[in-house]
Regions:
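Conserved catalytic core of sirtuin-type NAD+-dependent deacylases
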Residues: 2-266
Length: 266
């Protein structure tokens, strides 16, 4: 009989223990919005009634705007992308990343920045796309990942310009879901929430659909928490909320993280 080349028995046991521990980690689903990024210094449309540094949202963030003036749209998103290099993850982002030591943390974000990833979070679903990615204007399913981080043959720098194309010669556009467009990641987000053992809502009042419907997908026995400095953000959800933290994200999320560790035994 030939001796197997697999793991020795003690190693197999340790491997199975690790797999079992990983499988049993409670699933924490975080629904994050603009408020958590605002605390890092990023501008949001809500800061000034639909304006961003003087740009009207309807003139730069719709398919109609792209058709009418693509250069203006690219100028706007190039500026937003550049701002990412001026900010850092805050205490809320870091607290969520630290929870991965003890929990299966899955983030569903409405934000197009990369602050969750830069803080160390490894499972992030971007409902509305990502500023550092581009795609062909004719195909929402084709994404040139990270091309704006390192440059590439069609895009020599961090900005997109008219004439920057994919390998078929099709113009590139920001990989961002504009107002009026479908949300391709919605099904994945819904499946993520359905597996939650606890849900945290932070930096968003969850008033805009389709994202607003995600809370209703969480199993009824699953506790839902919210962190938001605006007490009215809980309106419409108070009967569903286990706890509400009327605090900025950078204060409330670390407090919630400590509480959830105690509650779920980690």
């Amino acid at each position: 009989m030939r001796k197997g080349r697999g793991l020795a028995m003690p190693e197999i046991c340790r491997h199975l223990v690790r797999m079992d521990a990983q499988r049993k980690k409670p699933v924490l689903v975080v629904l994050s919005g603009a408020g958590i990024s605002r605390e890092s210094g990023l501008k949001t449309f809500r800061d000034s009634d639909g304006l961003w540094e003087g740009y009207n949202v309807m003139e730069v963030a719709t398919p109609e705007a792209w058709a009418a003036d693509p250069e203006l749209v690219l100028e706007f998103y190039n500026k937003r992308r550049a701002q990412l290099d001026e900010v850092e993850p805050n205490a809320a982002h870091r607290a969520l990343a630290d929870l991965e030591d003890d929990f299966d943390v899955r983030i569903v974000t409405q934000n197009v920045d990369d602050l969750h990833e830069r803080a160390g979070s490894t499972q992030v679903v971007h409902l509305h796309g990502q500023l550092r990615q581009v795609r062909a204007e004719d195909n929402p399913g084709v994404v040139e990942s990270d091309i704006l981080t390192v440059g590439g043959p069609e895009v020599p720098g961090p900005d997109i310009a008219i004439g920057d194309v994919d390998d078929r010669g099709v113009q590139l556009r920001p990989h961002v879901v504009w107002f009026g467009e479908a949300v391709p990641m919605m099904n994945k987000a819904a499946a993520t929430v359905a597996q939650a053992d606890a849900v945290l809502v932070v930096g968003t009042s969850m008033q805009v659909y389709p994202a607003a419907g995600l809370i209703d997908i969480a199993p009824s026995e699953v506790p839902v928490f919210m962190v938001n400095p605006d007490a009215s953000a809980a309106d419409g959800y108070r009967s569903r909320l286990d706890s509400f933290y009327a605090l900025p994200a950078s204060e409330g999320v670390p407090q919630w993280a400590a509480a959830i560790r105690l509650r779920l035994g980690h």
